[in-house]
Amino acid sequence: LLILIFFSLASWAVIIWKFIELKRAKNACDEFLTAFWQAKRLDQLYEEAASVEGNPVVEVFAAGYREAEHVLQVRSKNTSVESSVLSAELSGVESVERALRRAANHEISNLERLITFLATTASATPFIGLFGTVWGIMNSFRNIGSQGAAGLAVVAPGISEALIATALGLAAAIPAVIAYNHFQNQIKVLSDDIENFTADFLNLVGRHFMSM
């Protein structure tokens, strides 16, 4: 029973924490995307975003912007080197794309943190409760055998323990599986926002490189 109580309390703590975290992340992402498309200078937006924490799209933007700045600095130092212009442009865009993908994967992994605990709770606690149920019934039969009678006073404690274990298992599993599916959907929405932003930012970088 203590194991089921632990899983129940821990899963509720995770549910509350992830609900707040994902809600804040979604609101922050929407605000930044609006600011991004309204911004006239990306360097100013980058400076403003440097102090922002807990926003996955900002982290992806910052990683891509830093890599783009690095590519431009390298190109400015190597202006005397003869090379294929198209090859240089593609190399720069690919470097920015790799930086964006790394940052996006890292942020998505952060969003998925502790979600697997809810899946574990949802799948394991019914079986733990079932084990408690079987154990309680076994105790009831043991009491019947030891006392040679099958009265209510003999079987009631074991049956009660069995039903409590079943109820605790379901009480832990049901909220966990509902929350898991809900959070997976929210993470999918945020992942789509990150992927769309990555593609849009990469297009902007590509056009900027080609215009130079």
Q: Where are the regions that the model predicts?
A:
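Hydrophobic membrane-targeting segments
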Residues: 1-34
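Bilayer-spanning, highly hydrophobic alpha-helical transmembrane segments
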Residues: 4-8, 113-143, 160-182
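A cross-family signal for key residues in well-ordered alpha-helices
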Residues: 13, 102, 119, 132, ...
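Alpha-helical transmembrane segments of multi-pass membrane proteins
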Residues: 14-23, 173-186
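Generic short alpha-helical hydrophobic face used as a protein-protein interaction/packing hotspot
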Residues: 16, 49-50, 163
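Predominantly long cytosolic amphipathic alpha-helical stalk/bundle segments
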Residues: 26-125, 139-151, 178-212
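Hydrophobic alpha-helical transmembrane segments and adjacent short intramembrane/lumenal linkers
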Residues: 148-162
